[in-house]
């Protein structure tokens, strides 16, 4: 199958450092290629270029990974059209972002949710169950060095940007033998705590 994955066009794919959505698209790209699919990543802010590239490429399927580009869906000549919103508060959006549900519902594309809870929220808002699927996300474990015996079997580590919505500060206060790696943007997170290892490069994390 010939598949197009469409990114936001702000960061490179794969990203040079952090970039959750960009890593996700890259992992999808690699996994689909392993399955024998012909996969192209289109990563630009130029909407006309996206439409022309997809229509000229005669793709069997397209998966749009940026909700703000939903209005181009009707102009795509493709049998299978899918769209995913990566807005982090989609399960409980602020009032100014509830429009995203109608935007995706009326896009004409099949909605791919990142979790069961997000799918349930779409259904609660009147979107037909046949037009919503769930595609769980994760990491490519083959890219990480995994030791057979853990150096610290009684500890876990949370990797990622530290921010209020992810509630690392809450976990930190529970003293649950959890370490944290990532750049901090949460004033309630205690960066002097010995469980905080600061920001590390992606390569260091994969190698260690």
Regions found by a protein language model. Name each.
Residues 9-11, 159-164, 184, 200:
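Short donor-sugar binding/catalytic loops of nucleotide-sugar-dependent glycosyltransferases
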Residues 112, 149-166, 170-179:
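Conserved donor-binding/catalytic core segment of Leloir-type glycosyltransferases
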Residues 62-63, 107-116:
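A short beta-strand/loop micro-motif in the catalytic core of glycosyltransferases
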Residues 117, 138:
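Carbohydrate-associated surface elements
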